[in-house]
Amino acid sequence: MNTKIFKSAVITSFISSCMLMGCNSNRTNDETNSANQMNALNLTSEWDKTFPKSEKVNHSKITFHNRYGITLAADLYTPVNASGKLPAIAVSGPFGAVKEQSSGLYAQQLAERGFLTIAFDPSYTGESGGEPRYVASPDINTEDFSAAVDCLMNREDVDSEKIGILGICGWGGIAIQAAINDPRIKATVASTMYDMTRVNANGYFDSENTAEQRNFKRAAMVAQRTEDYKSGFYKSGGGVVSPLPDDAPQFVKDYYAYYKTPRGYHKRSLNSNNGWNVTSNLPFLNFKFFDYADELESAVMIVHGDKAHSFYFGKDTYALLKGDNKEFVVVAGANHTDLYDGLSVIPFNKIESFFNENLK
């Protein structure tokens, strides 16, 4: 196969693929409602994460809802023997992953360091609700972070003035977008971030940044939605390409090494399996993140490996932010997926210090 053609096809396919208590800790009707929601969502009771459970934290499952009425499922992590009101962090990502993968690892690590954390599945994915399944939306997914903040604000074990968020990969960009619109969020970390609106509109490395190329994508996707309506079935874009050809781009090989091997595979992960619905890309072509990034007053830390194919997303987004409470942490030698689960690579000490400084 022609290498150039293969890489273009793989990259286009990958963009398609990437795309038991209540939240209130009092025993009230909210708890009964949440229990009913959990039963409706059929949440698993087993520990099915891609990482071992820590003895330093307590774990349970909770649910909450966004303002579109979608019920989201989350894992709650709290430090063992914690008391009083804690600073809290909501975590999600990577884009096309589930809470049993990278976001859960981050949440557990931060709970070990004294924070109450939740790792949640976005709308339409994982154990969360929403139909049809495997849909991504720049609006609804941004709302998901604010819905997580709603949940945390109403917990009696959370200090409502000390709430932060952390997004990984595509959810890093979504986290920053959420923080722009939600001043309740006092601190945001974007780890190995993507700007999903930019990559969908412009292609990787801005290689498809013309009106003609965008219109070609639009035409292809609206043709697909016509076919989806006719068939009554939403075509999936496919997860990470498998089997992996030798001439795949290095970053696709890195994704394969995480999503398609025992290291990070999960049965509910879109990227590990069949990916997003193809038409999920469409709204990202018509929606631009960070137009008001210079108005974001709260603290932001962007963490990126300098060997990541996605490094330019972090670098360029950081340049849009204003204020001395913004920080860009470069992890020397790290690629994109090293920051998914690399406990010796992810700068947890810096992340902990950042949240301690800004959630006080």
Each predicted region: which residue ranges?
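N-terminal cap/lid segment of alpha/beta-hydrolase-fold proteins
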Residues: N39-G84
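Short beta-strand element of the alpha/beta-hydrolase
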Residues: K85-P94
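The serine-hydrolase catalytic nucleophile loop
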Residues: G96-Q108, P122
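Conserved alpha/beta-hydrolase
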Residues: Q109-G129
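Alpha/beta-hydrolase active-site loop
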Residues: V135-E156
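Alpha/beta-hydrolase-fold enzymes
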Residues: Q177-K260
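Short beta-strand/loop motif that positions the catalytic acidic residue
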Residues: L296, I302-H304
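Catalytic histidine-centered segment of alpha/beta-hydrolase-like enzymes
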Residues: A334-V345
